């Protein structure tokens, strides 16, 4: 008899430190003054040339209302405080996810960690988490940039369906503030956060119904990581950057990636877009939910976005949006939900899930 797999619990955690746009206005006024000549404005540039062509590009058209704002629609972001670790956030989320699923450490067969980026260079967080949680099963790392949480869900569900593992704990984090210099305007749309969820057997016909995942190799040569010398400590550090072609490449591939994944997952699940109650995209920009709705031909009211609260939190976006939808009562049992995430130089993925009540962690404070 086939086993259905789905979420048993979902938890999110964010740093207490909230950084608003006034931080840069106060501490980096020259950067704000010259914002249109800096990274973020080059990344999300004002359209030039053929107006009709710009309007036909749904991603660019959705961006237009935000291009006169130097922060491109970002209002605030959560960032790690001095002495606060990504492992702290991950462990808090993981412990709550286990508690809400009614499980003890010994009930977990596998832990999958998707830390973007991990606490230590070259070594992922999975064994550190497993040790701290007292797990005795398998623990490994998975990374496919901003799609890590959804691909981890796909991986975990496959193991449960195959009866290889019964309970899989997935822990996801993003700490962009560690690699985004404050004098680089790209830091304006980046934040930190963590999430955790347990995947296990669910009632037949519920949980994950279909998946479709593709690579995003067409975005190779866009975002990158490099080494730089910290001016304060004179020590090497990792910094995030973007090439000149990044914005154009992301805009060109946004719609093809979304439609391919969404249609592929819907086909596997045997449903149509009209059957879906809520579309939970990862939302790395202020306009992404509107873009996604237009690309799939659905009403924007059927989408959810926490970008205004958290900015771009990479692989944590999808679980954060899903948690927000559930905690604000936008999901009911048996609702069909489309989950979608896209990462640069990594993967794009979509899932169709038939919702059931899950052990939901506490809503983050405002």
Regions found by a protein language model. Name each.
Residues 1-83, 184-252, 256, 260, ...:
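Condensing-enzyme catalytic core mediating Claisen C-C bond formation in acyl metabolism
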Residues 8-11, 143, 168-174, 199, ...:
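Short beta-strand segments
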Residues 18-19, 122-125, 153-154, 179-184, ...:
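Short acidic, glycine/serine/threonine-rich loops at helix termini
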Residues 48-119, 125-126:
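Metal-dependent C-N hydrolase catalytic cores
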Residues 62-68, 117-134, 170-175, 229-234, ...:
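Acidic-glycine-rich active-site phosphate/pyrophosphate-binding loop
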Residues 66-70, 93-109, 260-277, 325-330:
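Phosphate/pyrophosphate-binding loops at sites that engage ATP/ADP/AMP, CoA/4′-phosphopantetheine
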Residues 91-94, 117-119, 128-131, 136-162, ...:
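Claisen-condensing/thiolase-fold acyl-transfer catalytic domains that form or cleave C-C bonds
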Residues 163-194:
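Flexible, glycine-rich active-site loops centered on histidine and acidic residues
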């Amino acid at each position: 008899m086939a086993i259905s797999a789905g979420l048993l619990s979902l938890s999110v955690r964010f740093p207490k430190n909230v950084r608003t746009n006034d931080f840069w206005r106060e501490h980096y006024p020259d950067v704000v003054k010259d914002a249109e000549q800096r990274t973020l404005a080059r990344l999300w540039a004002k359209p030039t040339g053929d107006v009709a062509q710009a309007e036909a590009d749904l991603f660019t058209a959705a961006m237009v209302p935000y291009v006169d704002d130097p922060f491109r629609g970002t209002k605030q972001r959560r960032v790690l405080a001095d002495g606060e670790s990504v492992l702290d956030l991950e462990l808090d989320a993981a412990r709550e996810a286990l508690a809400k699923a009614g499980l003890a450490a010994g009930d977990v067969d596998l832990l999958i960690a998707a830390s973007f980026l991990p606490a230590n260079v070259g070594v992922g967080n999975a064994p550190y988490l497993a040790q701290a949680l007292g797990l005795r099963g398998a623990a490994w790392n998975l990374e496919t940039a901003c799609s890590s949480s959804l691909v981890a869900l796909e991986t975990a569900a496959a193991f449960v369906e195959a009866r290889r593992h019964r309970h899989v704990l997935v822990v996801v984090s993003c700490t962009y503030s560690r690699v985004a210099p404050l004098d680089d305007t790209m830091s304006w749309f980046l934040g930190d956060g963590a999430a955790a969820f347990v995947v296990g057997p669910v009632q037949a016909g519920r949980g994950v119904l279909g998946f479709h995942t593709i690579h995003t190799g067409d975005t190779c040569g866009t975002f990158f990581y490099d080494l730089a010398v910290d001016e304060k400590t004179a020590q090497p550090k990792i910094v995030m950057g973007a090439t000149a072609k990044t914005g154009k490449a992301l805009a060109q591939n946004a719609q093809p990636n979304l439609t391919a994944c969404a249609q592929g997952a819907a086909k596997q699940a045997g449903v149509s877009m009209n059957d879906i109650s809520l579309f939970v995209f990862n939302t790395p920009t202020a306009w992404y939910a509107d873009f996604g709705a237009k690309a799939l031909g659905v009403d924007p009211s059927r989408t959810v976005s926490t970008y205004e609260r958290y900015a771009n939190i990479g692989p944590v976006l999808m679980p954060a949006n899903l948690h927000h939808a559930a905690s604000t009562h936008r999901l009911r049992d048996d609702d069909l939900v489309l989950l979608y995430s896209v990462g640069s130089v990594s993967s794009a993925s979509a899932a169709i899930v038939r919702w059931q009540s899950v052990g939901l962690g506490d809503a983050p404070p405002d």
